[in-house]
Design a protein with these regions (language model features):
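Membrane-interfacial alpha-helical segments at the cytosolic side of multi-pass membrane proteins
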Residues: 23-30, 127-145, 175
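Interfacial helix-loop-helix junctions of multi-pass membrane proteins
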Residues: 62-69, 121, 155-175
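Membrane-interfacial catalytic/cofactor-binding modules of polytopic membrane enzymes
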Residues: 59-139
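Divalent metal-coordination and catalytic microenvironments
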Residues: 18, 41, 61, 126, ...
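Interfacial segments of alpha-helical transmembrane regions
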Residues: 22, 26-60, 66-78, 82-83
Length: 175
C-alpha cells in the first residue's frame, strides 16, 4: 500500500463515500420491495449517527494521525513518516484528504463550527456507515451489489488508516 498508484486508488475510493452513501439513501428511500428491511436500514443509519457520531465521539474525543503532530502529542514524529509519504505523493497528483485535513485544522484553530467541520477520530463514521451499507448489500439478491459494498467497506476501512484520518482501532470500534 506504499505506492502512489495504490494511494491514488484509495484516495479516489475514499472520496466516493458521500456519493455512495447518498445513492444508498436515495435507493432505500424510494424502494418499496422490502419495507421491513428499509425501515431497519433507516433506523440503523440514524442510530449509527446518534451512538457513534455523537455519543461515542464525545466519550472518545480524539484526533487522527493527520492531526497528531499539529495537536502537540508526544512523540511528535510518531506519524511523520506516514504524513511525509502522503505529502510526497501529492507533489505529482493531488491527494484530496490532505487539503481537507488542512481545511479542518484551520477550522479548528479558528474555532469554526458547522456541519462536517469536526476532527474527531474515534469512531469513524465513514467506516460505520460503509459497514451498514455492506450489511444492507448482503441482504440483496444482486451479487454485484453484495461484492461492491463489501469491497467498498474494506476500501474505506483501509483508506481511513492509509490516508491518516484514523487509527485502526477507530474503525474496529465503528463496526
Amino acid at each position: 500500500f506504499n505506492g502512489p498508484l495504490t494511494t491514488d486508488l484509495i484516495n479516489i475510493g475514499y472520496n466516493l463515500w458521500f456519493p455512495v452513501m447518498f445513492f444508498i439513501l436515495y435507493w432505500q428511500a424510494f424502494t418499496f420491495k422490502n419495507p421491513c428491511l428499509r425501515l431497519k436500514f433507516f433506523y440503523s443509519f440514524i442510530l449509527c449517527w446518534i451512538i457513534n457520531g455523537v455519543l461515542l465521539a464525545t466519550i472518545f474525543s480524539s484526533v487522527g494521525p493527520c492531526f497528531y503532530e499539529r495537536a502537540g502529542f508526544l512523540p511528535l514524529d510518531a506519524y511523520s513518516e506516514l504524513m511525509a509519504r502522503l505529502n510526497a505523493f501529492t507533489e505529482s497528483r493531488p491527494i484530496w484528504a490532505l487539503s481537507t485535513q488542512d481545511s479542518l485544522w484551520r477550522n479548528y484553530l479558528n474555532s469554526e463550527t458547522g456541519l462536517g467541520s469536526g476532527i474527531s477520530a474515534m469512531p469513524s463514521m465513514h467506516v460505520s456507515i460503509a459497514f451498514l451499507m455492506m450489511l444492507l448489500g448482503f441482504s440483496q439478491e444482486n451479487k454485484f451489489l453484495k461484492v461492491f459494498l463489501c469491497l467498498f467497506f474494506i476500501l474505506i476501512l483501509i483508506g481511513s488508516v492509509h490516508l491518516a484520518w484514523h487509527y485502526a482501532v477507530d474503525g474496529y470500534l465503528s463496526i
